[in-house]
From Swiss-Prot:
CDD domains: Ribosomal_L1. The gene is rplA. This is Large ribosomal subunit protein uL1. The keyword Lyase does not apply. Keywords: Repressor, Ribonucleoprotein, Ribosomal protein, RNA-binding, rRNA-binding, Translation regulation, tRNA-binding. HAMAP family: Ribosomal_uL1_B. PROSITE patterns: RIBOSOMAL_L1.
Length: 231
């Protein structure tokens, strides 16, 4: 059996196996256990009572977190005319059409979110092999193909997170950073859970939100007592 590192021992001593933590207590403990030299993200994993093998039970959406994620988000927008001006005014980092597509084909992909107006999809459609593997392909299901590109830019800049169930029916997303106020983190997670409940597939039976786990980038996962959340 491999020996535990000093950090792993310290973590093991602080965590109670099998315990469900009050959210605020969990956030405080994760912050205490974060000893790495960079600002770790705080992530949530939500196990949903869905069968992801069934297309009508794949949960995919986006949520604007009330307090953002603490990350700087770079946004590119495919649109033209007045919508282009509106996107720039809303804070887009780059707006274009064929010129932007050419840049991306050449390898300029330093963006976290790519948004497109419906009339721009003729250009974006050529970028499937470039944007798809990076999870950047605009999609109407998560609000990144929309006539209102300015609002989509504002949402992205405000800390909108996008997610979909993995093969095990679990949603993974960042909800903040170590050092965030615990109450703000809690409100971010509550907003996410409320959205997940709102889009619950009609064919999903039994318990829907089965388990919520909070973790840091390099740290342990703590199971959250759902009774400590207002969602």
């Amino acid at each position: 059996m491999a020996k535990l590192t000093k950090r792993q021992k310290a973590i093991a001593e602080k965590i109670e196996a099998g315990k469900s933590y009050n959210f605020v207590d969990a956030a405080a403990l994760l912050t205490e256990l974060s000893t790495v030299k960079f600002s770790e993200s705080i992530d949530v994993a939500v196990n949903l009572g869905v069968d992801p093998r069934k297309s009508d039970q794949v949960v995919r959406s986006a949520t604007v977190l009330p307090h953002g994620t603490g990350k700087t988000v770079r946004v590119a927008v495919f649109t033209q005319g007045p919508a282009a001006e509106a996107a720039l005014a809303a804070g887009a980092d780059r707006v274009g059409m064929d010129d932007l597509a050419a840049e991306m084909k050449a390898g300029d992909l330093n963006y976290d979110v790519v948004i497109a107006s419906p009339d721009a999809m003729r250009v974006v459609g050529q970028l499937g092999q470039v944007l798809g593997p990076r999870g950047l392909m605009p999609n109407p299901k998560v609000g990144t193909v929309t006539p209102d590109v300015a609002n989509a830019v504002k949402n992205a800049k405000a800390g909108q997170v996008r997610y979909r169930t993995d093969k095990n029916g679990i949603i993974h997303t960042s909800v903040g950073k170590v050092g965030f106020d615990a109450v703000k983190l809690k409100e971010n997670v509550e907003a996410l859970i409320a959205d997940l409940k709102r889009i619950k597939p009609a064919s999903s039976k039994g318990i829907y939100v089965k388990r919520i786990t909070l973790s840091t980038t390099m740290g342990p996962g703590l199971v959250i007592d759902q009774g400590s959340l207002e969602a």
